[in-house]
């Protein structure tokens, strides 16, 4: 294989970042919606804090993309937002309102999204030594924050699952 046959690493990175940026937009929307759905509860307080952090992480990604001269893909962001909206339509055993099973599924979605974001920070950190635009200390801090978000979301998911599926839990 010749060097002409090799994919351009800058182009691959741009596509990768655009994909994650689209996911970040959907993640912010999901986190904010979950926080609103649980407002006035201890879970709502945790979700409001995590939603704020996820939005800050999206802003950090925007800054990184700017330093790398990568623009957001409007089409990908629109598609991710549409997917988040479609995800709201589900059978949850409740005709109107918010079901305890909805809470479990939404927390699982947040955990999956934050896990993907954590891997983004790990991937960028792995390449920071070859790209002066990337700040390894910043990426380590973002990775640590994603890990903290996952831990808090998993704890809330456990409580939500107990409440929804065993009836043994307390109000969230």
Please provide the spans of the model-predicted regions.
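Actinobacteria-biased recognition of intrinsically disordered, low-complexity terminal regions
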Residues: 1-7, 171-172
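Alpha-helical bundle segments that constitute or directly flank the non-heme di-iron/ferroxidase center
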Residues: 6-39, 105-128
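Amphipathic, non-membrane alpha-helical segments in soluble helical-bundle scaffolds
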Residues: 10-21, 44-51, 72-79, 100-114, ...
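Alpha-helical transition-metal enzyme core signature, strongest for iron centers
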Residues: 17-31, 47-61, 82-89, 110-117, ...
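Inter-helical turn/loop segments and adjacent helix faces that build the functional surface
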Residues: 33-45, 68-69, 123-140
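Carboxylate-rich helix-loop segments that flank metal/cofactor sites and access channels
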Residues: 68-100
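Preference for long, well-ordered alpha-helical segments
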Residues: 110-172
């Amino acid at each position: 294989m010749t060097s002409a046959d090799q994919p351009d690493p800058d182009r691959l990175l741009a596509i990768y970042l655009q994909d994650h940026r689209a996911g970040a937009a959907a993640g912010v929307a999901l986190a904010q919606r979950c926080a609103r759905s649980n407002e006035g509860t201890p879970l709502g307080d945790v979700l409001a804090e995590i939603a704020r952090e996820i939005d800050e992480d999206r802003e950090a990604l925007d800054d990184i993309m700017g330093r790398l001269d990568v623009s957001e893909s409007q089409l990908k962001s629109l598609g991710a937002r549409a997917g988040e909206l479609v995800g709201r339509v589900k059978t949850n055993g409740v005709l109107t309102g918010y079901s305890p099973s909805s809470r479990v599924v939404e927390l699982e979605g947040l955990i999956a999204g934050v896990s993907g974001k954590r891997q983004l920070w790990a991937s960028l950190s792995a390449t920071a030594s070859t790209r002066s635009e990337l700040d390894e200390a910043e990426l380590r801090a973002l990775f640590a924050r994603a890990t903290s978000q996952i831990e808090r979301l998993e704890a809330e998911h456990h409580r939500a699952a107990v409440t929804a599926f065993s009836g043994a839990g307390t109000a969230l």
